[in-house]
């Protein structure tokens, strides 16, 4: 018997539609207590997966709202248990009253992520898919949403399951050799096993290599705006954000510390870092800000060098150029294109690959800048169409990769079956942690605590 849980599945702000969600063995009994169907039938006699119009009632039998009810019998539901939803008008007052009625009818308030946790425990999805649910909810870009949907659809899970099943079959053969010493691995079998391990290693290497991109996609690309004072870095930051975040004045040294904000530019999530202008002199506070600018430049994945196109290059510009030349990705934004040009853009183009003219004041060239940023971070190839996006997944994949590489090496040089088997078991343990086949209870609790109530 599973305890029946209930929760508000939609937000707490007024909206057109609000949803109350139930799961557990007592769903029909709870519905009969709070829902009066227009057709007069009890919940158990309503057609599954069909919307039924009726009244939502409070504990005293008073009508709260005119609602739609839909029931999903087990096992064909999100959680694998009997489930139902009540679709109300999206007033927080209505939803709270409906939830109170369900709790009075014997339901328990669902905990954070408890619906998805039940789906995982009942085998409706693995741990990778469960984590993708919260990734999809939190998605800030189309790429993040696409990756989450791919994971929810099982793209990454299928790859992990294929590797896991191949290693399980191979481990079974080695168990037979260990248990029955007279048995041996034939040459043909050995080559097949080496092929299995080679494929597993290649797939895991691709997954692990994709984590750096997945992490950037999820957290945002660290992007430093660097240049001399009054080049227009803060104005460019504000233009990219679409609102005034940084203070802009004609006085050099206005920005004295790094200012960080997220923005989606060219479909890429950026962590924009506005920095103090690079120059010598200034007071102690400004000098500290300049030092932080240099540190930010070293850590950034993308550097946007901002130059003042209305002035010739200076020693401060050259210093800023030297700081960003080693950046993994670099774009030179020649700002103030709305003013008479004094900077030799042709000479810059000979030195740097991506040189663009922009005007933070008028918005000219910002679309080209967005396109240039998107070109720096194209959607890369992934195993099965999904990227690892969190440290837990990457750690498990790394441990699996290391164990598979050890097993392959041991088998290739003719080590005994028990040695190869030990490495295979280590790989299986790590892969089981990745998809949830062999995961600790405390880790499961930690993962689902990240979810919102009602999901």
Label each PLM-derived region with a short phrase.
Residues 53-65, 69-73, 253-281, 299-302:
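Switch I (G2) and immediately adjacent beta-strands of P-loop GTPase domains
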Residues 286-310:
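Inter-motif core of Ras-like GTPase G domains
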Residues 241, 276-277, 301, 308, ...:
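Short glycine-/small-residue-rich Rossmann-like dinucleotide-binding loops
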Residues 272, 306, 333:
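Generic enzyme active-site microenvironment
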Residues 1-146, 150, 154, 328-331:
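A glycine-rich (often HGG/GG-containing) alpha/beta subdomain
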Residues 2-12, 142-264, 281-283, 312-455:
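C-terminal-of-GTPase-core extension/linker across diverse P-loop GTPases
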Residues 89, 307-310, 336-337:
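Structural motif
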